Amino acid sequence: MKQIINPLKRNSNKIPIWFMRQAGRYLPEYKKVREKTKNFLDFCYDVNKATEVTLQPIKRYGFDAAIIFSDILVLPHALGWEVDFKENIGPILKQFKSQEDFKYLQSNPNNKLEKVYEIIKKVKEELPSTTSLIGFAGSPWTVMSYMLEGKGKQDFKTSKKFIYENKILAKELLNFITEKTADHLVNQAKSGADVLKLFDSWSGVLGEEEFTEFVIEPTKKIILKVKEDFPKIPIIAFPKGAVLLYEKFIKEVPIDILAVDQMVPLEKMKEWSDKVIVQGNLDPVVLLTNKEIIKEKAYKILQTMKGKNFIFNLGHGILPETPPENVKFLTEYVRLYEEKNSNSTF
């Protein structure tokens, strides 16, 4: 396999490390900044505050990558769709139901995404040159499912029923979001993002046929579109919960880096790393435990992936109740391991 050299700017034989939701509620310095802005989306669009919280975990832990502080739902919001975040509830959206809703979606864009690009530029100015900056977007199926459900975590009966019963409209919506997502990622790359990531949080609710149509196909289109303008930019895809369909995803989608959740067996990660860089997959709950358990679980991952195409991360985002000192311990442990075993492919 042709090596993707240094996707996270490590110019040595070391294991890149960063964490999903590394900028977030588990950090006291984040809470201090966040409490000054009541509305979450306003916070995401605040250039100075979003820049500050993006940089906080880099200053505290020295991760190999910063991920821009934003949200996957800024895209539909910027397209004029009604999106709000309720405390202790999560996202609440206008529910997409009809062709009239599609016409509305096509005709009410705003310039909110320009703030995201300003944040990327500002972070890039302040970020150490050895640290990568990751831009991201929600994958079309996940964004679409939020719009169809009108809220966050559900059983997805509404979304799945809609795509079964309204195939033409569902495909129109999917294609529209796919196009806008590709544009959003291209603009993030133009603004200075070194790496791009697609989060497909709800891909695991689909069967194989729908997974192909609503996850694989739009992801391929987005990657090919981005690569037209930025052929060398590494792209991470995270089809969370794909289980056995991860293998189909790897085979059919031209990704550089595959992020996997904690349900994926380590031996599968090792096998896949011969075809693609693999990122993952420590269970975030492990960081709620103690140092011995953290060390034990991290060691198993590191030993299995030793010498492979690998980025150390979690299987999902850092939980809000995570002790910051546990994140510090894990990061230092990975660094110590790599010092003793400096024969990684990176």
From Swiss-Prot:
This is Uroporphyrinogen decarboxylase. The gene is hemE. It is an enzyme of class 4 (lyase). Catalyzes the decarboxylation of four acetate groups of uroporphyrinogen-III to yield coproporphyrinogen-III. NCBIfam families: hemE (TIGR01464). It catalyses: uroporphyrinogen III + 4 H(+) = coproporphyrinogen III + 4 CO2. Keywords: Cytoplasm, Decarboxylase, Lyase, Porphyrin biosynthesis. Its main location: cytoplasm. It comes from Rickettsia felis (strain ATCC VR-1525 / URRWXCal2). Pathway: Porphyrin-containing compound metabolism; protoporphyrin-IX biosynthesis; coproporphyrinogen-III from 5-aminolevulinate: step 4/4. GO terms for molecular function: uroporphyrinogen decarboxylase activity. It is found in: Cytoplasm. Substrate binds at residues 21-25, 40, 71, 146, 201, 316. Its EC number is 4.1.1.37.
